[in-house]
């Protein structure tokens, strides 16, 4: 079930109230650009959640603010973002959720454990091409039996939305990104024995998103 996006915008403003103005604006822009109101709905209450490339911890913070009572673990290669995530988590210490963030590159070794939900939003296109498959395979391996991989990334069509995403990353991330076709992502997931459960476009404002939810079956 989708959430009211206006509630998430209010949450983002409150969770990062002490951040610099530019970073506060960035968190609210993420709520407008990403289908968080949908992806949060796929997360069961009390779930263990791994957020790969978590940035400033927004996704896990929104889950906690919406009463999901998750055990959240996020990592990101940007130390400034992780510092902001840690300060945000302090505001949620009485939410019933446990949030932990660490500075880690997705290409480095990951914790050897599995999760109820693994989340990837706008991550793969930032990973160098030679490492993209390995990072995705690690994400799949972290999904426990019965668990979900919630994946969202920029869509290839329509072209003007794709261009908007590319320009955004040139301005904000200062890099030329390397998206993986969504059909390739579906093939990689199938090779990792994950079944496709949800397949839809989730366009927001000028940004295009391909949203996929995969599940690891309880049986082979």
Q: Where are the model-predicted features located?
A:
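Conserved class I S-adenosyl-L-methionine
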Residues: 47-55
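Class I SAM-dependent methyltransferase Rossmann-like catalytic core
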Residues: 14-33
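Class I SAM-dependent methyltransferase SAM/SAH-binding core
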Residues: 58, 62-107
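N-terminal, positively charged/glycine-rich alpha-helical extensions of SAM-dependent methyltransferases
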Residues: 1-19
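A short glycine-rich, Lys/Arg-flanked "PGG" loop and its adjoining helix->strand segment in the class I
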Residues: 133-145
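Conserved alpha-helix/loop element of class I SAM-dependent methyltransferases that forms part
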Residues: 29-45
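A conserved beta-strand element that flanks and buttresses the S-adenosyl-L-methionine
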Residues: 119
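C-terminal alpha-helical "lid/dimerization" subdomain adjacent to the S-adenosyl-L-methionine
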Residues: 152-192, 198-204
């Amino acid at each position: 079930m989708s959430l009211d996006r206006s509630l998430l915008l209010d949450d983002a403003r409150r969770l990062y109230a002490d951040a610099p103005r530019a970073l506060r604006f960035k968190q609210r822009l993420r709520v407008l650009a990403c289908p968080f109101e949908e992806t949060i709905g796929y997360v069961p209450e009390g779930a263990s959640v791994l957020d790969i490339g978590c940035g400033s911890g927004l996704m896990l913070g929104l889950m906690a603010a919406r009463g999901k009572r998750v055990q959240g673990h996020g990592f990101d290669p940007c130390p400034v973002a992780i510092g902001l995530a840690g300060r945000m988590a302090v505001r949620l210490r009485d939410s019933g959720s446990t949030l932990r963030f660490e500075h880690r590159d997705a290409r480095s070794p990951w914790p050897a454990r599995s999760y109820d939900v693994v989340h990837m939003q706008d991550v793969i296109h930032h990973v160098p091409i030679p490492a993209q498959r390995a990072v995705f395979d690690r994400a799949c391996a972290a999904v426990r039996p019965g668990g979900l991989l919630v994946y969202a990334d920029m869509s290839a069509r329509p072209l003007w939305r794709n261009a908007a995403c590319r320009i955004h990353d040139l301005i904000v991330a200062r890099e030329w990104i390397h998206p993986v076709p969504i059909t390739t992502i579906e093939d990689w997931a199938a090779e990792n024995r994950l079944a496709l459960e949800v397949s839809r476009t989730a366009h927001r404002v000028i940004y295009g998103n391909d949203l996929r939810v995969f599940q690891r079956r309880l049986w082979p």
